Regions:
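Periplasmic-binding protein-like
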Residues: 221-234, 254-256, 300-305, 356-367, ...
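Extracellular/periplasmic Venus flytrap/periplasmic-binding protein
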Residues: 213-216, 261-262, 269-381, 421-430
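Extracytoplasmic "Venus flytrap"
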Residues: 147-155, 162-181, 205-211, 234-235, ...
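Beta-alpha junction/loop-to-helix N-cap segments that form part of ligand/metal-binding clefts
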Residues: 93, 100, 147, 173-180, ...
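Extracellular/periplasmic periplasmic-binding protein-like sensory domains
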Residues: 269, 374-452, 506, 516-522
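Segments of small-molecule ligand-sensing domains
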Residues: 126-131, 437-449, 459-515
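Signal peptide-proximal N-terminal region
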Residues: 161, 179-201, 324-329
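Compact alpha-helical subdomains of small soluble proteins
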Residues: 53-133, 226
Length: 522
């Protein structure tokens, strides 16, 4: 289907407020994948006014309601629409189309509907469904000033950082949320004048959460885009490729979204800094909770671990926790599934064969695989406890489970490395204010909060380094960071022998409304 034909068809539906669309979910789903990217691209372009976009979003959501009398169908169509909008944002973020093209496509859609910017005054405000669709802040413009610094990625006007993560594939929401949080922190400091007059700019490269693509993504950012350093890279198996490359180039590798030990050498690698607690610390906390507070026997605890270095890191943390409690770790049941899949049937079959009843599963998984495992075992093993580490993607996991029904979500535990996003701590309030200002409609999320906190720690060090910025000076400043209080409940510290700022773990559990509630782990 051509772009103009898609525009014509969706215009026909929208203009009639979907009176002819009732029950035709296949047509609407197809159109959602075509009009969604147009809307997503428009949302990242400052030249396209928000009310213009909102009119079409609201109209298409009316189409969804009319076309899907069943709630499950409506949810499915809305998710397709939201994913397509996110894809459109990525197209602009990655430079595949520019805002001139986005404006032209959006204007074609408006003309087909008989709309123009002149008759959009007083339109309806953002609806809750549209609010979930996307950021509105544009990418910062490229610097044009002649650089006075010889440091890579630094000019008189900007400092460029790179992020490699999954912006496509089954884990893409983790990459999007991490980038969102960093961008919110960068936008906040940029509006305050930047760092010594320099604006911070984040450039993304997609590796799809596949290590085979990570090296090319790193090279693209370092060689082609000439970034100063890396912040917020996502994943453990991908970090196994990215970290050696960053070390070879002596490039800063900061605040990655992983708790694996590959980023926690002893003594620390000079160019690698972590904000978050490790997977070993997360799994240690949850094992102690299960044994000491829930009174489970060690043999009643199993591990579902992704079959790669991420899963290995989480499983190693469980084994370490067993040993610390004086328990033999040799008999721990390890179940597995392949990365970027939801193929959990083999793991479930193995669970069925156990002579000792398993009462808890510590999951080292991504949100879709974790949700699929819970879906298929909730009735098979009544009362089974499920725990997850923070990398799972808390919001996405809750959403997936609530689509199945509250009984699938209720009681599922997730350990966190940031405070509750629904709380009122200074750090969380600052984050939510920035998120609301720069990305209106985006809901607070544990992953984007982590990105925001990591970026804020980096910004503090950049300020202290001064205008003559280079990597070595910045790292010296980072290694001298002491008692940095961001309002997280505990001060953050780095040192020459300590490149992990936080060791704090927060416990949370999903309630029957899909919301996270605090859970005392000790």
């Amino acid at each position: 289907m051509s772009f103009r034909l898609a525009v014509f068809l969706v215009a026909a539906l929208l203009a009639s407020e979907a009176r002819a669309a009732g029950g035709n979910t296949d047509v609407v789903r197809d159109l959602a994948t075509r009009v969604g990217p147009i809307i997503g691209s428009a949302q990242l372009c400052r030249e396209i006014d928000r009310p213009r976009i909102q009119v079409i979003v609201d109209k298409f959501q009316a189409v969804i309601r009319e076309a899907s009398p069943q709630e499950s169908d409506r949810t499915d169509l809305q998710q397709t629409f939201d994913r397509s909008i996110a894809d459109g944002r990525n197209v602009v973020s990655f430079g595949k189309i520019d805002c001139k093209t986005a404006e032209r496509q959006f204007s074609d859609l408006e003309r087909s509907l008989g709309l123009s910017s002149s008759n959009l005054s007083g339109v309806i405000g953002p609806s809750s469904a549209a609010a979930a669709t996307a950021p509105t802040a544009p990418l910062p413009p490229a610097a044009t000033a002649t650089p006075t610094s010889t440091a890579r990625g630094v000019t008189d006007n900007e400092i460029k950082f790179g992020i490699v993560g999954p912006f496509s594939g089954s884990a893409r929401e983790l990459g999007r949320q991490m980038k969102l949080g960093i961008d919110a922190a960068f936008n906040r400091i940029n509006d305050a004048g930047g760092i010594d007059g320099r604006k911070l700019r984040l450039i993304a490269a997609d590796d799809g959460y596949e290590p085979s693509r990570t090296l090319d993504a790193m090279k693209q950012l370092y060689d082609k885009d000439q970034v100063f350093g890396f912040i917020g890279n996502v994943g453990t198996p991908t970090a196994a490729v990215a970290v050696p490359y960053a070390l070879e180039k002596k490039a800063l590798f900061f605040g990655a979204f992983t708790g694996a030990n590959i980023l926690r050498s002893d003594p620390p690698d000079r160019y690698v800094f972590n904000y978050r607690a490790s997977y070993a610390e997360e799994t240690d906390a949850v094992v102690r909770y299960l044994i000491k507070l829930r009174h489970l026997q060690p043999r009643q605890i199993a591990v579902l671990a992704q079959q790669d270095s991420y899963g290995d890191a989480g499983f190693a943390g469980v084994a370490k926790a067993f040993r610390a409690l004086g328990i033999d770790d040799g008999s721990i049941l390890r179940l597995g599934y392949k990365r970027n899949t939801v193929e959990v049937d083999e793991a479930i079959n193995e669970l069925k064969q156990q002579k000792t009843a398993i009462r808890a599963v510590v999951m080292v998984a991504t949100y879709r695989a974790a949700a699929k495992f819970i879906e298929k075992t909730r009735d098979l093993f009544p009362g089974l406890l499920y725990t997850n580490v923070s990398f799972v993607g808390s919001t996405q996991l809750a959403d997936e489970l609530m689509m199945l029904g509250p009984r699938f979500a209720n009681g599922v535990i997730v350990t966190q490395v940031v405070p509750a996003v629904g709380g009122y701590s200074s750090a969380v309030l600052e984050y939510k204010n920035a998120l609301g200002k720069y990305f209106p409609g985006e809901a607070p999320d544990y992953v984007s909060l982590e990105g925001y906190v990591a970026a804020t720690v980096l910004i503090d060090a950049l300020k202290k380094t001064g205008p003559q910025l280079d990597s070595e000076k910045l790292i010296d400043v980072l290694e001298n960071t002491r008692s940095l209080d961001l309002g997280l409940g505990a001060p953050l510290n780095f040192g020459r022998a300590e490149h992990q700022a936080s060791h704090k773990i927060w416990g949370t559990a999903i309630d029957n409304k899909g919301k996270y509630q605090s859970l005392e782990l000790e």
